Amino acid sequence: MTLHVQSAVSLRPFNTFGVDVQARLFAQARNDDEVREALAYSAEHDVPLLVIGGGSNLLLSGDVQALVLRMASRGIRIVREDCLEAIVEAEAGEPWHPFVQSCLELGLAGLENLSLIPGTVGAAPMQNIGAYGVEIKDVFHGLTALDRETGELREFALQDCAFGYRDSVFKHQPGRWLILRVRFKLSREANLHLEYGPVRQRLDQLGIDKPTPFDVSRAICAIRSEKLPDPAVLGNAGSFFKNPLVAAELYATIKSQHPGVVGYPQADGQVKLAAGWLIEQAGWKGYRDGDAGVHKLQSLVLVNYGHASGLQLLNLARRIQADIVERFGVELEMEPNLY
């Protein structure tokens, strides 16, 4: 067996909240064989298996009585290309932002709006990550996953993944599919998405009237760096709450009481609200309780100022959820996976 299994390992370096909890067992899988070895070890020793990537979408509420398997596989390859587009495959353990930059350097467009999102390639399809008008589903071509129930490999095409807003089939079958590698359909011609005002405004400020995908990436990196704290400096998991979808009637009621409410009508008649606006209006922006708090510049982001426990962060999140229900009648859903 090439898999190196360690005991009693701190997970602080492996979650972006910087929560200091221990894993009963810990290993890193660099290839498919080591993934299978981890599954066999889990079964043989009757210990649960928790698979993580960059730990950027994870809230650990206590010590983990499991084998924590960190996906550490690396590799980027073009599997098919012509003069118009290319299919690029990346291993699950590839860090997301460097992968985006690698594709741009290859002259391939499509991922630039997803620049500087933390995490790994393998985790990206699980919640259909998105930003500034682009989601994974818009550039997704396929993925290879291991069925933990049968040990067999399965190929997923776009229609198999049931992608939705921060949602996919993988979130609805937790613990079954272990994503090994993902393929993206990228273009050699720029088809830029500049619908979001801040992106266009930043490009205008830079005096760029004919932006390239690189320009869009740089603009978005600058915007995200200003809005979101660096997890290496201040522990966080990015946006902690999803933007809620509400009925048009509830939106009208809220708007009558709060004319400044931010809402985006959806094709199905619902309205997507800005969770950050709701949290800020409720007075939580900049709130701090010990080392657990809400970021002073971005209400959507919960932060660990140093030694907050996962339970303290979770309790803060639940207090915010309860307050938003009481004030607006809106339920906020947490984005990070809780363990």
Swiss-Prot record:
One Pfam family here: MurB_C
Active-site residues (renumbered): 166, 239, 335
A GO term, aspect molecular function: FAD binding
Pathway: Cell wall biogenesis; peptidoglycan biosynthesis
Residue ranges of domain FAD-binding PCMH-type in the record: 19-189
Protein localization: Cytoplasm
Top-level taxonomic group: Bacteria
Entry EC number(s): 1.3.1.98
Disulfide bridge map: none
Predominant localisation class: cytoplasm
CC cofactor: FAD
Keywords: Cell cycle, Cell division, Cell shape, Cell wall biogenesis/degradation, Cytoplasm, FAD, Flavoprotein, NADP, Oxidoreductase, Peptidoglycan synthesis
InterPro entries according to UniProt: FAD-bd_PCMH, FAD-bd_PCMH-like_sf, FAD-bd_PCMH_sub1, FAD-bd_PCMH_sub2, MurB, MurB_C, MurB_C_sf, Oxid_FAD_bind_N
PANTHER family: UDP-N-ACETYLENOLPYRUVOYLGLUCOSAMINE REDUCTASE
The family this protein is said to belong to: Belongs to the MurB family.
Name the record gives this protein: UDP-N-acetylenolpyruvoylglucosamine reductase
Gene encoding the protein: murB
